[in-house]
């Protein structure tokens, strides 16, 4: 498995370089940025529709990053539903995973052709079957079945490598592509093993690594579908800035969901999930520090930590069935969102209007409130929908923020890089 700090350090460096290379004077005539999910990704899951074909390297990368990363988390949660023997949640997870696989295959087919998309889908579906078999074997303590599922997953990785080499017309070697997927399958097996052993700290650490690994794999899959000179656009600093923020903000959304749901599972799992929320907050704070300097980064960390606390206070109130505390938490969340929106608007010199960013953060909070309410009521299908819609919406926020940073912000790095504190303050009262 990759070193835990690898992606975070990469993102911090990218944020600093990208802001330096792409900062431009603010223009009074610049249109107000959107805070909705990007058109290439947004609004599809609620209606269970198709995905619009990407026409540019940036659009395709954004799609594949989203779909690979989200698919990873759907698979993780589906495997855990097997381990915990929660059939109602498993039914919802199975359905969402199947549907998302079809949509992912549609994105791949749009990039590489329908025939290659269909071949990819067969490989991916086989992988899902083997992940499920692995989880069932772990749950049943069946060593022979576990080994058979592992062998199947490694064969799936080889099949993916052969497919990718052919689909990319040799731009990617089969062995290199297979190695990427071998890392993926090993991570998902490792998290299942850790979760079954109640080593929740390890399970959630590996889950986060798996999300980041497949987000990056999505970028690579997108690049390989274009000639090298066209694909080079994805190496531009502003594109790396976009990808860095999208990865971290999407990860924030997903880790909050994990932690809110872990509220119902008991303190050990809650603390393990919350630790990864804090690690994500630390990474976001470092990224902000690379762009705006350590003083502003500390302001961000404080505002973001309040945002996190409000969301987790709400889920605690839901778990306790405390209507008064739920109402109080919602009121506090509105104040936290306003403070965070003011900070973000200020650092980009009002290039990002206060109203839209406040509304976007409020929508983010609402997605998380709705999903935990649905989860608590065992409306697992609704909870899944809120999860997917909320993830897409956060990618839209990332694009909006990157656009504003690109137009206005220059990094203010101290000697030795950004010196910020560590993490948010996710905790259960």
Each language-model region and where it sits:
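Alpha-helical rod/repeat scaffolding segments in eukaryotic adaptors/tethers
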Residues: 53-58, 83-91, 113-117, 142-146, ...
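Alpha-helical segments in soluble extracytoplasmic regions
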Residues: 75-165, 213, 256-347, 390-394
């Amino acid at each position: 498995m990759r070193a835990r700090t690898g992606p975070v350090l990469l993102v911090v460096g990218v944020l600093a370089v990208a802001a330096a290379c792409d900062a431009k004077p603010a223009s009074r005539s610049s249109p107000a940025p959107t805070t909705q999910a990007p058109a290439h990704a947004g609004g599809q899951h609620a209606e269970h529709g198709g995905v619009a074909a990407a026409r540019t390297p940036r659009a395709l990368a954004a799609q594949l990053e989203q779909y690979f990363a989200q698919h990873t988390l759907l698979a993780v949660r589906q495997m855990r539903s097997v381990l915990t023997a929660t059939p109602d949640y498993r039914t919802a997870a199975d359905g969402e995973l199947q549907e998302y696989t079809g949509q992912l295959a549609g994105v791949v087919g749009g990039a590489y052709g329908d025939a290659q998309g269909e071949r990819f889908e067969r490989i991916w579906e086989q992988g899902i079957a083997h992940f499920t078999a692995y989880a069932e074997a772990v749950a049943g303590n069946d060593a022979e079945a576990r080994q058979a599922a592992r062998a199947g997953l490694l064969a799936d990785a080889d099949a993916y490598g052969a497919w990718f080499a052919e689909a990319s017309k040799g731009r990617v070697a089969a062995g290199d592509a297979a190695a990427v997927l071998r890392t993926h399958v090993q991570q998902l097996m490792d998290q299942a093993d850790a979760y079954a052993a109640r080593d929740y700290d390890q399970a959630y650490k590996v889950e986060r690594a798996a999300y980041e690994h497949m987000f990056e794999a999505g970028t690579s899959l997108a690049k390989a579908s274009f000639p090298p000179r066209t694909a080079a656009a994805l190496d531009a600093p502003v594109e790396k800035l976009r990808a860095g923020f999208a990865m971290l903000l999407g990860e924030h959304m997903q880790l909050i969901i994990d932690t809110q749901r872990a509220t119902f599972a008991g303190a050990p799992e809650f603390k393990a999930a919350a630790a990864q929320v804090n690690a994500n907050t630390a990474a976001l704070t470092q990224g902000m520090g690379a762009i705006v300097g350590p003083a502003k980064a500390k302001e961000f960390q404080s505002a973001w930590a309040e945002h996190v606390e409000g969301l987790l206070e709400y889920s605690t109130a839901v778990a306790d069935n405390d209507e008064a505390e739920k109402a109080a938490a919602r009121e506090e969340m509105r104040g936290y969102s306003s403070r965070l929106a003011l900070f973000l608007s200020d650092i980009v010199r009002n290039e990002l209007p206060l109203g839209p960013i406040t509304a976007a953060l409020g929508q983010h909070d609402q997605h998380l409130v709705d999903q935990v309410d649905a989860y608590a009521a065992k409306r697992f299908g609704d909870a899944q929908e809120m999860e997917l819609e909320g993830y897409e919406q956060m990618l839209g926020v990332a694009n909006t923020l990157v656009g504003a940073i690109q137009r206005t912000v220059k990094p203010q790095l101290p000697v030795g890089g950004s010196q910020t504190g560590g993490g948010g303050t996710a905790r259960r009262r």
